[in-house]
Amino acid sequence: MTDISIEDINELVASQLGVRVVTAHDRLMEDLGAEFADVANIIAAVEEKYHIVVKESEIARIFTPADLLQLVEKKVV
């Protein structure tokens, strides 16, 4: 199993959004200013990095990097 940390997810989100600091509970849209296309790019980067597939229905439940980490941890084996 691949070890995935919140720091890994925060760095990925920060890189995709072009921001310096991201915390686990920052809301992607409200706090970090992400738009739907940005979230789609974040999901695509996560899928590529961790070799997973995120369903459209799952995307609707991702509000923070912590939510994203929880989803990735469930899918990575």
What is each residue range found by the language model?
Residues 1-22, 74-77:
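Thiotemplate assembly-line natural product biosynthesis machinery
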